[in-house]
Amino acid sequence: MSVNLHYEDKARAAGFSAVCGVDEAGAGPLMGPVYAAAVILPEGCEIEGLNDSKKMTEKKREALFPVICEKAVAYAIASVDEKEIDATDILSARMKAMQLAIDALQIPADYALIDGNRDHGASAKITTPHEIIVGGDGASLSIAAASVLAKVSRDHYVVEVLDPMYPEYQFARHKGYGTKLHYQMLDQYGPSPVHRMTFLKKWEARR
């Protein structure tokens, strides 16, 4: 299925007026926050080249970021930091970040399209009326837009804030994912204050 407004149009036909797409980025890395974005696009919106952010090059994501912001009726970006991820769990952190993004929209959303197969964790859940769509970032235009905003925003935070704070870990190169280089830096320096300790079991087991 190509990325389109099928789900948005279906929700509007059911009587909802402000339909947002929601996605998150950074659930898998060993450090830093998880980010989420919510985007409301106008009816009939077209954004050439937009797809699931994971299927796009970094250059393409960067180019589309301002286009999405300009075309959106409303958008918002939120995050939950590594301390809260460790204190709760990554699923709850993802849900909290997504609901925070929805709540921060300049226009209140009355319906949300959520990427994934879950809408709640142990300590957080999506409270806005919604539907969950497996592979939504490759099907819904507004979810795809949210995936780009979340991914680019997190990458910028890692590169512009965390990498200068902890240059020895070379966060800008791997964005915190469990790459060979990242594990080598962990072996050499141990965890930083921004590492998710609950995510380091694999590293600890191989020491």
Language-model-derived ranges and their functions:
Residues M1-R207:
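RNase H-like, Mg2+-dependent phosphodiesterase core
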